[in-house]
């Protein structure tokens, strides 16, 4: 008897639980037939010009029978060196470094347009977006929420593509430098075509931001336009001012005096969006299903987002009242120090946010991220200390980073042979930025030491690309947290790490960045199928008690607490109209 047959006849009482009265076979494929349909993505225009700091509305046209996935398509303007005001930066080198005759090769590299879009510009530019049916708001979401949700649900396979869709790339979020290569365009140009080349401008780029409304994430919840003959569907969009999306200064020198003080590049902040529109995936149904969809009433179990606004806190112990309704699947909260998002202070030389190249709207930790978005940070140069006063001043983006890290007690003095024990925080370090990537080596005037890049151009590109998802920031601002419902503890007090590590690990696809906290009432909150809720409509008093770290609210420091809740509701559609079954 063959071995396979021996296994086959080795059949006992326990096998009845596995193979008795079988219901499926692995040896004959089965499938189910589906209703015929077609799908097409069609552009929808806004009423009025969509631009930074404006509110625009798009009325969804009835091009198809159902409306499914919806994307914001927006084209960012180019930010280039021609935007530098005339006369800015003259004699900057001599004032900063004390040299009366800076080298000719330095001229024009002390000042320019140093600009970057803040992280995740596609998400950051969205202040608010909402869906209306017949004048009733059905759901409202925020760019901050989109970032948090994608931190929890985005798979590793999707991350690279999503980052490019929303503009979180080195081409857009890494600082420009006048010594870098020009932007490559579609027409004939002498600029390098390789994407790894650092650029002296932020290129005109089209972003695609997917909305996360209930009808966008599940085809079974697609909006039945054919059944809403008497109600219009509108999408209202609020865009942030450009000041909260862009960081652009005329110099990277961290020296404040009349000659060298960096200035805001006003022309860059006067730019408008090149284009903005929505793309909606329309579904076309076959005749029979189309008739049923139009004539029959419908009830959809939908998901909504609840957010009652920021709450300012300035002490370590806080009670946050939760004014939520409906059966909620989970609570998600972040605590963001105000110092992380001080957009005005980020343009003032000497401030921490200036040194790290702008505000950090998606930093939910209790410390500034001191790993800045700059190619310069990955190119180190050895140079004789005396040459700092007489040679090219294009040294110190990394030195300035080291100054910041030293001031934060992250590193000590830089002490290696031939450097003559120069403190990175000393005045002799001056200001400036690192040599261009094309500089292989050079002999400093009067010096005995060559300076040479410790990382190759290819290595620099690898480091910058991998650093997009790397951070040198703080810890979770939440030291402990506890939820109380009608005065009773829903769970015992837990450390903050339980809410930003254990809970996401248990209930979500992905472990998010530090500081994104959650507590889930559902087994699988990402799925539409309900798997557990807490009905906050039946809770009179819900309170989230938070103890925050000293780094977050110590001294005069303040922070904002944002608590989000995802809930179920019922959308009823009948007689050509639609509305919610349960209001707030």
Curated annotation (Swiss-Prot):
GO cellular component: viral capsid
Recorded family membership: Belongs to the NCLDV major capsid protein family.
Record function comment: Major protein of the capsid.
Protein known as: Major capsid protein
GO molecular function: structural molecule activity
InterPro entries listed in its UniProt record: Capsid_N, MCP_C, MCP_C_sf, VP_dsDNA_II
UniProt keyword list: Capsid protein, Virion
Family matches, as Pfam families: Capsid_N, Capsid_NCLDV
Gene3D superfamilies: Adenovirus Type 2 Hexon, domain 4, Major capsid protein Vp54
Annotated localization: Virion
SUPFAM superfamilies assigned to the protein according to its UniProt record, in alphabetical order: Group II dsDNA viruses VP
